[in-house]
A protein has these predicted regions:
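Short, Lys/Arg-enriched N-terminal segments with co-localized hydrophobic residues
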Residues: 1-5
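Sec-dependent signal peptide recognition
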Residues: 7-13
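C-terminal motif of bacterial Sec signal peptides marking the signal peptidase cleavage site
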Residues: 18-21
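Bacterial signal peptide processing site
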Residues: 23-25
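N-terminal mature ectodomain segment of secretory-pathway/periplasmic proteins
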Residues: 38-39, 45, 51-124, 149, ...
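Flexible, processing/modification-adjacent segments and terminal tails
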Residues: 46-50, 117-182, 208-211, 271, ...
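Short, hydrophobic/aromatic-rich segments at coil-to-beta transitions
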Residues: 68-75, 94-100, 161-170, 196-197, ...
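Gly/Pro-enriched, hydrophobic low-complexity segments
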Residues: 166-270
Length: 280
């Protein structure tokens, strides 16, 4: 009789432990943040497939290591339609909160996190505000895909010129930057998971309707790895359409050189600077 009772107790204990173990395992699985359906995800903090896609690209480029540095600087030589468009040195916080551009002809543009300034006061540079905000964004784009105010469409699989891509449209919440109505069509190489190219419109100083008549694209033609961080040092610009993708000959190009991370940088606005207002 004692043996039967002990046997029953033993079976009950084993069953209880098994039940607890199953529940604990199930809870751990539920606690994992896994991608779910496209519609913004469900559950406790689970990302959508689109967000997981953007996070995956940032991880491939090593966003965490990029943001671990305080500042980055690089020389840029930018050309459009066979003409020099911009040449000088950008210095910026890795989170883009402050940016400085020093041109080869002695002009300096500074974004101090709130306003844009040009020095010296008598300098004329019609594109100063556009330049200080646009080209640094293109450099840092692979690290900014999940910034506040970003909105992602569903991810699609496409093939262009025998190359397979994951593609999604990036838009922005109202009030983000100077031109929240800009959009990007982001193409990620399925073999490397690096950002290959991004089609875009520029609404700076123009309507969306006008901008959508001439979409362009930036092709990140080459990547260098600095401190385990993938940064593109060679850009090509093309015309683009939804039907054709990139087409025609390049309409512009840029070369980045002397790319380096800096512990400190000076973003002080000089006294002889003038403020550059945002477009209406």
């Amino acid at each position: 009789y004692t043996f039967k009772v002990m046997k029953k107790i033993f079976i009950i204990v084993i069953a209880t432990l098994f039940f607890i173990s199953c529940n604990d395992s199930q809870k751990r699985e539920q606690d994992k943040k896994i991608p779910v359906e496209q519609d913004n995800g469900i559950g406790d903090g689970a990302p959508s497939l689109s967000t997981a896609f953007a996070q995956g690209v940032e991880k491939t480029h090593n966003k965490e290591a990029f943001l671990a540095h305080n500042n980055i600087s690089f020389d840029i030589a930018l050309n459009f339609n066979g003409q020099e468009r911009l040449k000088g040195t950008f210095t910026m916080r890795t989170n883009s909160s402050k940016i400085k551009f020093e041109s080869k002809d002695g002009k300096t543009i500074i974004y101090n996190g709130e306003e844009v300034y040009l020095t010296p006061k008598e300098a004329e540079m019609e594109s100063a505000r556009f330049d200080i905000l646009t080209w640094p964004y293109f450099m840092a784009m692979p690290f900014k895909l999940t910034d506040g105010g970003t909105i992602w469409s569903d991810v699609k699989q496409v093939t262009e010129k025998n190359r397979d891509y994951s593609k999604a449209k990036l838009t922005f919440e109202a009030g983000v930057g100077d031109t929240a109505e800009d959009w990007y069509q982001v193409y990620v190489d399925n073999n490397t998971n690096l950002l290959n190219y991004a089609a875009y419109i520029v609404t700076f100083g123009k309507s969306v309707t006008k901008a959508e008549q001439e979409p362009h694209a930036i092709l990140y033609e080459n990547y260098v790895v600095i401190d385990a961080i993938a940064i593109s040092d060679t850009w090509k610009f093309y015309n683009w359409s939804e039907e054709k993708g990139l087409y025609g000959e390049p309409i512009g190009d840029a070369t980045l050189s002397n790319i380096q991370f800096l512990e400190s940088a000076d973003y002080t606005v000089p006294k002889n600077a003038k403020k550059i207002e945002a477009p209406n």
